[in-house]
């Protein structure tokens, strides 16, 4: 990682921090506990020899400054900015004191044991609590999935496997992807790709998707949906990383509308694999159990601030497992953006002597990511209020804590 660049980022946001605007909160409401479930920040795509990317186009892929799958230097900068912004917000709500390190054990950071997730958590802590001794907890063996964040099938019955595959096929059947495949074939020159010339796989539109739900493995798919996801993911990461536009998809994406059409493949891949209720409830169970413990069963002794860092599959399956209502993120084509956080907030209403839950998706817009915009309360991250089907919200986005508890209690059964 480029430490000079990171240090400059930390210094830069301190200069922008003055005159921060207050966020409107109902009178008498006090924030008491926060849990953030974050996706890792910007990583390099996997474009090694023989990969889906290399097989899908005759074109040469641009070089990245880190190995495939690892957090980039810019990803670190972006996460420092997000950490700084969240610190400002927490200070505004009285959860931390400006210019001071939080007392021991009040902040707990826990990441999946891959480089991109652990590094994301480290950079978030650097931005939020610079100079403070707050460790990032993770499994000792790096490069392996932590069971809490590992979205694998945990039912070994043949009946469940069949049910899960049928559920994934049903999710895919809801999608209209022909236009997306046709545009993608044109962008990558698929007819001249190694996949076409060597394997006679020359059409994404006509290709067949085959789903799998094997015990102790992630839900999977082979076929055009996987190819499409890999390609659009790579283009999206190029855009965020700040590659010149003539290098992003070789200059072939000319409009926002084309980005929207292509993003249907990436979102559709995630929706098909991880958002059917049957699959989501199974693969998200360890994460749901962890969140239930922190926010419900052990909340009186839990850290005031918990930061969890995992993957888009964790967030997608969690949102379905808890039965969130459909949501729309503005200024973003990704359903679960890079570096985005589901922020669970437990509030106390002193006037009515009751506890409330508010849940927001806090994320950086596509332009904030590409431009590496520093974030403050004056130049904030994007925030979208989410709603659980089992916990209806009021006009300010709050729902009763007892109803939230019931949702979690049901989800961990």
Curated annotation (Swiss-Prot):
Regions crossing the membrane: none
Chain sites annotated for binding substrate: 39, 43, 116, 218, 311-313
A GO term for molecular function: 3-phytase activity
Localisation per UniProt entry: Periplasm
Stated family: Belongs to the histidine acid phosphatase family.
SUPFAM superfamilies listed in its UniProt record: Phosphoglycerate mutase-like (SSF53254)
Chief location bin: periplasm
Active site: 40, 312
Function: Absolutely required for the growth of E.coli in a high-phosphate medium containing G-1-P as the sole carbon source.
Swiss-Prot/TrEMBL GO biological process terms: glucose catabolic process
Top EC group: hydrolase
UniProt keyword Isomerase present: no
Catalyses which reaction(s): alpha-D-glucose 1-phosphate + H2O = D-glucose + phosphate
Subunit structure comment from the entry: Homodimer.
One Gene Ontology CC term in the entry: outer membrane-bounded periplasmic space
Enzyme Commission no: 3.1.3.10
Pfam name, any one: His_Phos_2
pH dependence: Optimum pH is about 4.
Region forming the signal peptide: 1-22
The UniProt record lists the keyword Signal: yes
Regulation acting on activity, per entry: Independent from inorganic phosphate availability, and apparently submitted to catabolite repression, it is positively controlled by cAMP and the cAMP receptor protein.
Keywords recorded for this protein, A-Z: Hydrolase, Periplasm, Signal
Name of the protein described by the UniProt record: Glucose-1-phosphatase
InterPro entries the UniProt entry points to: Acid_Pase_AS, His_Pase_clade-2, His_PPase_superfam, Histidine_acid_phosphatase
